[in-house]
Amino acid sequence: NKAAITPDKFQRVIQEMQEADIKFLIQQSNLRNSETGSQEMKDLRAAIKEADSNEKKAINKLEVSGYASPEGGLDLNTKLATDRQKNAQKFLQKQLKKDKVKTDIASEITAEDWAGFQAAMENSNMQDKDLVLRVLGMYSDPEERETQIKNLSSVYKTIAEEILPELRRSRLILTTDLIGKSDDEIKELAKNDPAQLNVEELLYAATLTNDNAEKIAIYQKVASQFGDYRAYNNMGMIYFEQGNIAEARRAYGKALEIAPNNADVNYNAGLAAMADNDLKKAEEYLGKAAGTQGNLSAAMGTFYTMKGDYKAAKSAYGNVATNNAAVQQILNEDYAAARQTLANVKEPNATTAYLTAVVAARTNDRDAVYSNM
């Protein structure tokens, strides 16, 4: 049974979004200086320049969307949303030209912003907002819903004065790629200045080497800097694969002190306990391993085989094709099934060949005995 690694969550490129709204007066699409000169717009402009000039950033997408509030007619709203989008985009293009930023601009319009209306209502302090939304939700026809919104806005001032004006807008959205450290940078820092790396970067550094001693050294740094259970678990996995069961169990024990209910750590601790013939502890750990990335069915099959409960082992293994599953089938004298299992082992090794020879010997297949010895 293979131990389960607890992986890093390192992402070299992380995306962040920044938005700015330009509001319009009712049934108008002309830009106002109070809107184009807002702090929100200034911040967006600065973010675009920064994303364009910083080598650790890149503009992923720049989008301008035009909207109309949902109380007007469809034709009027479509024209308003289109004009608002176009005017906002022209303004943005002029800014980009001044700032010498070259990038494409995506466009979109929403003629009747019903979704925006619902969201604004839900976030409002209006006392009857749930009732209003339930009433409007009864109308699937947009034109009928427009009429009802008009009627309600004449009754509820909050709708007319606070909700609808927020929906008469263009929205400018910048998506920026934040570009992380290169593999070479991470390897260098992991070796000489690990304090400059966050926990995910340092865990990722361990995947950049095939030297187990280097991996363990990195995991020790993760453990000392961050106290992250994954460092101990992954150290334990290396020790387990090296056959150093005592060190593996110690490492898994430390991981369990931090994350006692983690399925992968419990699974690994169970494997190590079985390797130590500590079936009582193995049963305890494997009982908490539901949801592990590891092959829990195979582990339980091995556990029951070690206990001598071959019927339970057969049930646990199911159709798993592993050497241990074949051992259980051989013990049950189900040689045809064992032969099939061994033929389907994904990574056959010397044990696979030996077990195939055992099956051949038990079924008087001399040629197969010799070819697998």
Predicted features and spans:
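Periplasmic peptidoglycan-binding/anchoring modules of Gram-negative envelope and division proteins
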Residues: 4-6, 24, 29-65, 93, ...
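Periplasmic OmpA-like peptidoglycan-binding domain that tethers envelope proteins to the cell wall
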Residues: 69-173
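Short coil turns that delineate tetratricopeptide repeat
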Residues: 196, 226-227, 260, 291-294, ...
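Canonical positions in the second alpha-helix
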Residues: 221-222, 254-255, 286-289, 313-316, ...
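TPR alpha-solenoid repeat register
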Residues: 231-232, 265, 296, 352
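Register position in tetratricopeptide repeats
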Residues: 241-242, 275-276, 306, 331-332, ...
